[in-house]
A protein has these predicted regions:
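Acidic, contiguous N-terminal accessory segments
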Residues: 6, 25-154, 347-356, 363, ...
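Flexible, acidic glycine-rich loops studded with aromatic residues
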Residues: 361-367, 374-513
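Active-site beta-loop-alpha junctions enriched in small/polar residues
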Residues: 166, 195-199, 255-259, 316-318, ...
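Active-site neighborhood of glycoside hydrolase catalytic domains
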Residues: 263, 268-367, 372-385
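Bacterial Sec-dependent N-terminal signal peptides
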Residues: 1-30
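Hydrophobic faces of well-ordered beta-strands that scaffold small-molecule active sites
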Residues: 159-163, 190-192, 250-254, 309-313, ...
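Extracellular glycan-associated modules
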Residues: 503-671
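Feature activates predominantly on carbohydrate-active enzymes
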Residues: 102-279, 286, 292-310, 339, ...
Length: 671
């Protein structure tokens, strides 16, 4: 590793010297801002002005990268990039795919002079080079690039994120956006946690009523797939194909033998009577038949549903109460590592073998272990045993939205200033220790039913993604102070053609003098930090009449239950204690941020819907906060010590006006 780094520096210095000589030693452009930070940069004089043409050298694989690049370039800066052949001319962008050991499997070289050239030895490296050019392009009004040379090789080969889709359904549309966001920031691993369950204390202490879901279409066990949201096998395959185009590896996770309530709901006889129905019974042969059949469905054949090289088998948080169950857990873990490998995949596990210390051998060679808590898996001992470690320390990089424990929002300042993947809990390894593959962060949706939406998750996820991408790529070598990083990162898009936060440019407003029923506005929604104002001459509105709808939310002039001003998103109905009376003219304003949604009537604050701490003892105390949809499950708290913080945020919908009778005038939306 050290020899390779020396060679990279030698390559960089050689490139810089030749570049500087050609420009008469004029080197004035400072290192440009991108995320993650460029590892090495030598500035030159002047700016590169794009011609709108690109050349590809490297065959069909490079052509595919170039096509994605051109489409993203057009989406991001509004200018077209078209292919050409022959020698490059001033303003052309050249993509070169050729062997170069010094760049490794993901590094690239970026030469920006009269011609911009991206050189990489792998498709992945070429993709990352295009992401850098895109970020540089969007920061200049004419898409001009600062002249100079960058040699950019990541410190860690695995840079990732895990999404808990089991406790909360995350729509495929968002996962596709997430792939593009991760790629834009050179994060190359997305782990999708496909099954999990809520906490029993929120569901009357009854396992049979406790939320549980397996999110993937399943033919082997008809009826297993979640009814409140799932992915078809076809769309899951398409997600992986999209990820491959963008340099992102999908790691699907089926979590067994704990966190398995979705499976015991389907087949109760394989649930543990001793440790709880969220645990599989490790001593029941039917358990192994069931789990074998489940993995087999997605792993067998020439074109399996799980396309990637790695499959995660879970093995998280099983009881270690007795010696015999510990040994059986170790047997189970070893069995499914080898079972996954029998289909040509690398197995990944959650670290648990310190918690489950025993005599039964568990395969370690070529096994990926996610080290999340050192009490469950001592990382130095796991290194000694031969596991390949992924640094995902719970006390630093776990987001559990609005739960009151772990992080609601990561401490990005602390992570940026002090953390790298070499830090696993309180254990510090040498940087680039070969046993550490890289680092990840995670979103765990522990409190199923707490009102959190995908928009809320995104608000927590995105700044963490930008920060962790830097710390996993640039490592300890970041040179920019955090405050400057935190300010400049806001100038970058989430990804080309992606705006999940519904951010508007500064100063942008939407003004409609007379809002007509059914009118479209040209805007889908507006994100946190908005103010929506309008005047209403009230009419006799039917219950369930919207003011506005979008794909993600509805704002009601008269809600479906009581006819109040209200909003609904993702199955949660939240009502203001205010009705617009027939024949009355009032001025309404709605403001919203990441914590609350507020109603103003005639200029005065009428009601603030913020986080609501619930200690409910009866089901009726929660139902008023839930969707009127009778198929929606509703969490119940029987234990006053089990507190849930119910969230009432809203990204305001603007896509289409409802079919209302009232007269709505003076609509003004600001951000």
């Amino acid at each position: 590793m050290i020899k390779n780094l020396i060679n990279v520096k030698r390559l960089f210095l050689t490139a810089c010297c030749s570049f500087a000589l050609s420009l008469g030693w004029a080197a004035i452009n400072e290192k440009p801002f991108v995320v993650p930070e460029l590892k090495q940069w030598s500035g030159a004089d002047g700016m590169f002005a794009p011609s709108g043409k690109y050349i590809v050298k490297g065959g069909k694989q490079a052509e595919k990268v170039a096509q994605v690049f051109a489409a993203d370039y057009h989406s991001l800066v509004g200018n077209s990039l078209t292919p050409k052949t022959g020698k490059p001319s001033t303003g052309d962008i050249v993509l070169v795919l050729k062997a170069d050991k010094l760049l490794g499997t993901e590094g690239y070289r970026l030469d920006i002079s009269d011609v911009t050239t991206i050189t990489a030895s792998t498709v992945e490296g070429l993709v990352w080079g295009t992401r850098t050019v895109l970020q540089l392009s969007e920061q200049n009004h004419s898409a001009a690039l600062p002249k100079g040379v960058a040699v950019d090789v990541p410190e860690y080969g695995l840079r990732g994120f895990m999404m808990d889709c089991g406790r909360k359904f995350i729509p495929m549309s968002y996962l596709r956006s997430l792939v593009k966001m991760m790629s834009y920031y050179k994060m190359n691993t997305l782990q999708i946690h496909l099954n999990d369950n809520g906490f029993r204390q929120f569901f009357n202490g009854d396992w049979n009523k406790t939320q549980a879901a397996f999110r993937l279409e399943c033919d082997t066990y008809p009826g297993l797939t979640a009814k409140d949201g799932h992915y078809t096998k076809a769309e899951f395959i398409e997600l992986q194909k999209l990820a491959e185009q963008y340099g992102v590896n999908i790691i699907p996770e089926i979590d067994v033998p704990a966190h398995s309530l979705a499976f015991t709901h389907y087949k109760p006889e394989i649930g543990s009577k001793e440790y709880g129905m969220d645990h599989l019974d490790l001593f029941n042969p039917e358990t192994y038949k069931f789990v074998d059949g489940l993995f087999k469905e997605y792993l067998e054949g020439k074109n399996p549903v799980f396309r990637g090289k790695v499959v995660h088998i879970g093995t998280d948080e099983y009881s270690n109460a007795k010696k015999d169950v510990v040994e059986k857990f170790r047997y189970f873990t070893d069995h499914y590592i080898k079972y996954v490998e029998s289909f040509g995949k690398q197995a990944a596990v959650w670290g648990a073998l310190t918690h489950a210390k025993g005599d039964t051998k568990v395969k370690s060679q070529n096994v990926m272990m996610h080290c999340w808590y050192n009490g469950y898996a001592d990382p130095k001992e796991m290194k000694r045993q031969g596991y390949k470690l992924v640094s995902v320390p719970d006390g630093l990089v776990y987001i559990v939205p609005a739960a009151g424990y772990y992080y609601d929002y990561l401490n990005c300042r602390e992570l940026y200033n002090t953390w790298t993947p070499a830090q696993i809990g309180d254990e510090k390894f040498d940087e680039r220790d070969p046993s550490i593959l890289g680092g990840m962060f995670a979103v765990w949706n522990d409190h199923a039913g707490n009102g959190i939406t995908v928009k809320d998750i995104h608000d927590r996820l995105f700044p963490a993604l930008q920060t962790l991408s830097t710390k996993c790529w640039t490592g300890a070598a970041t040179s920019l102070p955090y405050d400057k990083f935190d300010s400049l990162r806001l100038n970058l898009s989430e990804a080309p053609a992606v705006n999940e936060a519904a951010r508007w440019p500064k100063g942008k407003m939407l003004v409609i003098d007379n809002l007509c029923p059914g009118q479209t506005t040209g805007e889908k929604e507006v994100g946190y930090g908005y103010r929506v104002e309008f005047t209403v001459d009230g009419a006799d509105e039917a219950k369930g009449t919207p003011l506005f709808t979008s794909d993600n939310a509805t704002f009601y002039l008269a809600d479906p239950q009581d006819g109040c001003l209200a909003f609904e998103r993702e199955g949660y109905l939240n009502k203001f204690k205010y009705k617009i009376a027939k024949g009355k003219k009032v001025s309404i304003a709605i403001t919203g941020d990441n914590k609350k949604t507020c109603l103003y009537v005639d200029g005065k604050l009428r009601e603030e819907l913020g986080p609501l701490a619930i200690y409910a003892m009866q089901q009726k105390d929660l139902t008023s906060f839930q969707s009127p949809d009778p198929t929606a499950w509703q969490p119940v708290m029987y234990n006053p010590s089990a507190k849930m913080y119910y969230q009432r945020t809203l990204v305001f919908p603007l896509q289409k006006a409802g079919e209302f009778k009232s007269k709505v005038t003076g609509l003004k939306v600001s951000f």
